[in-house]
Amino acid sequence: MSNESIKAEQDLIQEGVESEVSTEEASLIDELTQANFRIEELEQLLADALAKVEEQKDSVIRAAAEVDNIRRRAAMDVEKANKFALEKFANELLPVLDNMERALQGTNPQDETTKAIYEGVELTQKSFLTAVAKFGVKPIDPQGQAFNPDQHQAIGMQPSAEYPANTVMLVMQKGYELNSRLLRPAMVMVSQGGPSQEINIEA
């Protein structure tokens, strides 16, 4: 075999090897490119999934806060309902208390014929007030106190040397409150005369 034919054969082998290598290289580059695309795709999917998780987490936190708010509001509503459920019933009892008050005012405790009636009505009134106080009903008797438009209703004003101006000089009808909430204002006569009484409002 001549040198030229050996050389030609070697060139042919070389070309085949180079062709094979370049085909393999192209195939590897193609696979690598596809793998890179797939990685980018997966990274995008992961980023989307993480964003959805954050969004869902945010929704869950908001929903939990809303549930807490609803629970708190419901508890407050139940507490208010329990506290003031007696309001209508208590309002119906006020005329009974007023009648007992009038019976005491119209009866002379010194008179032997009416003394027993007076004591009976007084005892009944005390028992009745004790019973309703257990449920938060308390009388408002502002005799001699400064006039308070939040708790008192002025029937009229009269000059008075005995009471300072804007002072309750006469209670026509007691007021009542239920758990510190006004049921009925006290009906009062307010003084016009004398020195003005200082109203001390503590903050």
From Swiss-Prot:
Gene Ontology CC terms: cytosol
Signal peptide: none
Job description of the protein: Participates actively in the response to hyperosmotic and heat shock by preventing the aggregation of stress-denatured proteins, in association with DnaK and GrpE. It is the nucleotide exchange factor for DnaK and may function as a thermosensor. Unfolded proteins bind initially to DnaJ; upon interaction with the DnaJ-bound protein, DnaK hydrolyzes its bound ATP, resulting in the formation of a stable complex. GrpE releases ADP from DnaK; ATP binding to DnaK triggers the release of the substrate protein, thus completing the reaction cycle.
Subunit structure: Homodimer.
Xref: PROSITE patterns: GRPE (PS01071)
Region (Disordered) location: 1-20
Highest taxon listed in the record's lineage: Bacteria
Naturally occurring in which organism (per UniProt): Shewanella sp. (strain MR-7)
Assigned protein family: Belongs to the GrpE family.
Protein name: Protein GrpE
Basic and acidic residues composition-biased segments: 1-10
